[in-house]
Amino acid sequence: MGLFAEYGVSGRLTLQLKADWQDGEDAFVDYSGRGPIEIGATWQVWRDDRNAVSLYGGYTQAGEGRNAGYAAPGVGDHDWEARVSVGRSLGPMGERWGMDGAFVELQAARRLRDGLPDETRIDATAGARIGEDWMVLGQAFGGAADGGARWLSLEASVVRDFGAWSMQAGWRQTVAGQGIPISRGPVLAIWRRF
């Protein structure tokens, strides 16, 4: 179970917090405990009517659970991450298919890790609103640890708005990789805007 919180300090600066509790088992070990806790900030560097570019910097303190999908539980100490995100509104293109607010986003990150190999990550998202209260999302999460594990997970989900609250339901699955466990399962989330 995880927690993700984001707070807009200003129109261009947001603060983030990520934390989770892990309870898992694989062929070699059962584990339960606090996962990594990450704090960070995102600065919107540039924006126009259809495009946006932002930079993220974050720090992660490792936990007792898996701090990396390819490492044993509890391995690793702390991480630093730098990330750039580029997003684009598809404007009228999405409207032709009955979607409003269609967008794509690409993120590239470098994670410097203490006690684990450094990582390069690439994440991509495509999404669109369907009507006033629904959104569909397709996401890909890929990465490579220096000299080791590689992974690609895909996620498809729908989000339903209920005023300031939203519920997300979907499925995430590892579709390719090397030196990592294959994972798959439901994605359930509750969002609150304030």
Could you say what each language-model-derived stretch is?
Residues M1-D114, D118-R121, A128-R193:
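Transmembrane beta-barrel domains of Gram-negative outer membranes and organellar outer membranes
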